[in-house]
Amino acid sequence: MNAVFTHRLARRADIPALNVLMAASIRELLRDFLAPEAVEASFDVMGLDTQLIDDGTYFVVETGDVIAGCGGWSRRATLFGGDHTAKRDAALLDPRQDAARVRAMYTSPPFARRGLGRLVLGLCEQAAAAEGFARVELAATMAGEPLYRACGYAPIERFETDTRSGVRVPLIRMGKRIG
């Protein structure tokens, strides 16, 4: 039997479940792309940015009462990272010149490769376009890059980000025109 998926905006009450989902996603979905120490180091630079929930720009995808995936977009300057990540910037972007950010895309491992990422990306792109943004950018993990390429995102730059352990985590800044 196929699961029926619905989506809605995330609420603060979802935070505990989102943190569990994100941890499982990082641990399981990155392991085919990164060395074990880089997977663990990824927790330093990935996770939930609750500003997205507060801004009303973070979506959850559910089946029944289970959150199967999540992700959002932002009108703020931060490109990636959770509440605990250094160098976050809450400055508002100008849709006339800046790209909106797609942020914190995660799928619960049992629901991977079932179209949830594509669904959330579409929701993010529609919402950003409705606010006047003509472009979106994101920081892709190695595991996420194939999805983003398939959805029309092009690499802008490859980079590595520092972590507390000294292990550098590879990411790819990617972008797409939406308007």
Locations of regions flagged by a protein language model:
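Conserved acyl-donor/pantetheine-binding loop and adjacent beta-alpha core of acyl/acetyltransferases
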Residues: 55, 62, 68-112, 127, ...
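Conserved GNAT-fold acetyl-CoA-binding loop/helix
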Residues: 23-48
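Conserved acetyl-CoA pyrophosphate-binding loop and the N-cap/start of the following alpha-helix
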Residues: 111, 115-123
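Short loop/turn motifs at secondary-structure junctions and domain boundaries
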Residues: 49-55
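Conserved N-terminal entry element of GNAT/NAT acetyltransferase domains
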Residues: 1-16, 179
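C-terminal "cap" of GNAT-fold acetyltransferases
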Residues: 134, 138-145, 151, 157-179
